[in-house]
Amino acid sequence: MKTENQLSKIKPADRLASVSEYYFSKKLKEVAQMNAEGKDVISLGIGSPDMPPSESTIQTLCDAARNPDGHGYQPYVGIPELRRSFAGWYKKWYGVELDPNTEIQPLIGSKEGILHVTLAFVNPGEQVLVPNPGYPTYTSLSRILGAEVVNYNLKEENGWMPDFDELEKMDMSRVKLMWTNYPNLPTGANATPELYRKLVDFARRKDIVIVNDNPYSFILNEHPISILSIPGAKECCIEFNSMSKSHNMPGWRIGMLASNADFVQWILKVKSNIDSGMFRAMQLAAANALEAGEEWYEGNNKNYRNRRQLAGEIMRELGCTYDENQVGMFLWGKIPDSCADVEKLTERVLHEAHVFITPGFIFSSNGKRYIRISLCCKDDKLAEALKRIKGMR
């Protein structure tokens, strides 16, 4: 048995020094402790849909789980039924033709795809372009894997779009890939065909890979669009998608990526050495969910529209301004000039009103004057959060 002195000599890998524990991992522990103390915190932090998948999706899962032959390892590439359903979904809603056999790779949630893509494309010491503000995992996983993170700015005055004049002036000689995320997290900015055309042109001229993370395109968005709809995009782009947001299945961990056959095969070479596929019943249920019609998305969005109105009232009560044209499942707002520090504001709201709101600084420096409110909370809870905030001293 090792003594305490011996254990003290064991150190973690050096790569852990490049990252810290995920903000929400730490903060939700604090929220849980407050709840355990009877403080009843209303969480408006993370984007975890609180509505269920469709009834037919759940029924398909239950029926398939009863099949005694469905509990073994499944193909690394995903079952054909799921890949065909993803292809049909992209054709129906995005107008994009994908070969289900070679151009689609199901994922255990699109978050793991960040790891797989970085391992497949980026050598230690090479650079990746990451948006500021942006999803923190792009930065943390890049650093863990030895890549050098180079931020590019997204600013409110530019509609939270990349500044291509600024990008053109950057040294791209060591850049391997560029992360984009539209509809955007955390800002709610929506993509346009013009933006995607510029990104594809930029990638082709600079010989880099664009990875577009696209999980929010069905939330409060009348016109879903894929970067792969742009001619030539498959040659230089990878797109992630997820069933977590569009189909209310965050805990199922089912996502996908799409690109050209070579890129998909390189990623599969990594992925097949990391996991052993997904439970067959979940894949069949996901395939069922992808067959949903327009009424499914509209039913979700009716709820989100009501919630966004309440979130807007919370923003105004806090003196924040926001763009009413945002899409996705969050509301992003700018704090008033009279507020010196966004974290002090969100901490005050947490400890006085017992409402958890995300401070924008966690998405990097361009978010330091902003807050984000999740719409993944029922109307009565949002109304109660508003009431509590109005009652703050």
Provide a role label for each language-model segment.
Residues E37, L145, R205-K206, L318, ...:
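Helix C-cap/helix->beta junction micro-motif
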Residues K2-G109, H116, L290-A292, R393:
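N-terminal small-domain helix-loop-helix segment of the aminotransferase-like
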Residues E126, A147, R205-V209, A233-E235:
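A short helix->loop->beta-strand "cap" motif at the edges of active sites that frequently abuts
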Residues V150, L154-I225:
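Active-site phosphate-binding strand-loop segment of PLP-dependent enzymes
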Residues A120-S142:
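Conserved PLP-anchoring active-site segment centered on the Schiff-base-forming lysine
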Residues K2, V150, E168, C339, ...:
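PLP-dependent enzyme catalytic core of the Aspartate aminotransferase-like
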Residues G232-R305, Q309-L318, M392-R393:
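Conserved core segment of the aminotransferase class I/II
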